[in-house]
């Protein structure tokens, strides 16, 4: 992320060097942080590469998340309270790419932000809102897996009403955080190569810097700690279960107890937890660079280049592509329904054999009720 070489001004206008900030239209010049005046415009090649990558990622994300929403809402066996979190995740990922990638591609074609100050703020707000909702949807999924696997029968079953209330809280709080920069706590500004907008992480006053810090605590650190807590206890529960199974098998003088129905149910729950853990791990690796960029900006600890900042933004948006792929490859019941409804898109071996599908469906529905 740090720039290893100082910028070299290769672009000239009226006999003087042209900076990156001077490439934007006059109507949004006041929104550009002075930091960007030290950089020349990017080579046109980079706009083409970034636009192409975003277009591919956006198309894949829109198609993949639409399919996830369709499969989970159209299949009765998948319409469970727990899977409402999955559908919400797919919806927020879909909306993030729906609102993010067309402007980046369009502005990349012109080499700068051409959509005016209002749409810049709207773009930044949508990115903040849908990114926050996606992160907290994955947090709810992780905590739900914790309740199912660790607490087991001792837990209070999740109802549809409880799931809806949790999602309403997430949308309300994330919406409030996304709106705050529009009312004076920080602001949304052009960033990187000037084809996208985000929070102002180069603000010099601590009032605006505090927004980045507090927001990151809500949208990054708190979810991360919740996820670590959930999966730490899940791994402990799985290890304890495996140890108990081995000891019981030794007492019964048999090789394995894997044929028991209780163990089949536990295996399904563990597989679903692995799917969620994979999804969340991908989110962590996608959003961590962008978080580092924000902190590097407010604490002035790195000399950030336009290319590094826009790549961090693109990397974060790429997470919206990963989730439908993970569920398509790993979620047993999802794969089964996808194979039935869209056989041309099904991939991999069906984890549920014809003799066990009815039982597995009941187990999944029952465990997520």
Swiss-Prot record:
Q: What is its main location?
A: membrane
Q: Which family does it belong to?
A: Belongs to the G-protein coupled receptor 1 family. Opsin subfamily.
Q: List the Cytoplasmic topological domains.
A: 72-83, 144-162, 239-274, 331-369
Residues where N6-(retinylidene)lysine is found:
317
| Extracellular compartment spans | 1-46, 110-123, 187-210, 299-305
* Bilayer topology term: Multi-pass membrane protein
PROSITE patterns the UniProt entry points to? G_PROTEIN_RECEP_F1_1 (PS00237), G_PROTEIN_RECEP_F1_2 (PS50262), OPSIN (PS00238)
User: What are the subcellular locations of this protein?
Assistant: Membrane
Organs and tissues of expression: Each Drosophila eye is composed of 800 facets or ommatidia. Each ommatidium contains 8 photoreceptor cells (R1-R8), the R1 to R6 cells are outer cells, while R7 and R8 are inner cells. Rh6 is expressed in a subset of R8 cells, most likely expressed in the subset of R8 cells paired with Rh4-expressing R7 cells (R7y).
What does the record list as GO biological process? cellular response to light stimulus; entrainment of circadian clock by photoperiod; G protein-coupled receptor signaling pathway; negative regulation of transcription by RNA polymerase II; phototransduction; sensory perception of sound; thermotaxis; visual perception
Q: What is this protein called?
A: Opsin Rh6
Point out the gene that encodes the protein. Answer: Rh6
Disulfide bonding pattern of the chain: 120-197
What is known about its processing and modification?
Answer: Phosphorylated on some or all of the serine and threonine residues present in the C-terminal region.
Q: Does the keyword Membrane apply?
A: yes
Keywords attached to this Swiss-Prot or TrEMBL record, sorted alphabetically, are: Chromophore, Disulfide bond, G-protein coupled receptor, Glycoprotein, Membrane, Phosphoprotein, Photoreceptor protein, Receptor, Retinal protein, Sensory transduction, Transducer, Transmembrane, Transmembrane helix, Vision
Which Pfam family is one of those matched by this entry? 7tm_1
């Amino acid at each position: 992320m740090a720039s290893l070489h100082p910028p070299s001004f290769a672009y000239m206008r009226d006999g003087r060097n042209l900076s990156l900030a001077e490439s934007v239209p006059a109507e949004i010049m006041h929104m550009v942080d002075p930091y960007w005046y030290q950089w020349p415009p990017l080579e046109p090649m980079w706009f083409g590469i970034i636009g192409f990558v975003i277009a591919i990622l956006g198309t894949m994300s829109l198609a993949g998340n639409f399919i996830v929403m369709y499969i989970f809402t159209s299949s009765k066996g998948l319409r469970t309270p727990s899977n409402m979190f999955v559908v919400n995740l797919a919806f927020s990922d879909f909306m993030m790419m729906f609102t993010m990638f067309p402007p980046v591609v369009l502005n990349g074609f012109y080499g700068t932000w051409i959509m005016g100050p209002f749409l810049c703020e709207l773009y930044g707000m949508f990115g903040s809102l849908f990114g926050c909702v996606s992160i907290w949807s994955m947090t709810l999924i992780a905590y739900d897996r914790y309740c199912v696997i660790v607490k087991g029968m001792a837990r209070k079953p999740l109802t549809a009403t409880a799931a809806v209330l949790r999602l309403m809280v997430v949308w309300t709080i994330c919406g409030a955080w996304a709106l705050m920069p529009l009312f004076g706590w920080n602001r949304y500004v052009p960033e990187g190569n000037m084809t996208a907008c985000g929070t102002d992480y180069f603000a010099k006053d601590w009032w605006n810097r505090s927004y980045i810090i507090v927001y990151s605590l809500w949208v990054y650190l708190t979810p991360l700690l919740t996820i670590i807590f959930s999966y730490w206890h899940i791994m402990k529960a799985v290890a304890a279960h495996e140890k108990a199974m081995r000891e019981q098998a030794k007492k019964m003088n048999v090789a394995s107890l894997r044929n028991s129905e209780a163990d089949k149910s536990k295996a399904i729950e563990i597989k679903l937890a692995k799917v969620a853990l994979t999804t969340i791990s991908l989110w962590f690796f996608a959003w961590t660079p962008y978080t580092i960029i924000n902190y590097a900006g407010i604490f002035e600890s790195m000399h950030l280049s336009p290319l590094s900042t826009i790549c961090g933004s693109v990397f974060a948006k790429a997470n919206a592509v990963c989730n439908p792929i993970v569920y398509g490859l790993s979620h047993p019941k999802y794969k089964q329904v996808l194979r039935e409804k869209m056989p041309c898109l099904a991939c991999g071996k069906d984890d549920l054999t014809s003799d066990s599908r009815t039982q597995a469906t009941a187990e999944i529905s029952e465990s997520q009720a």
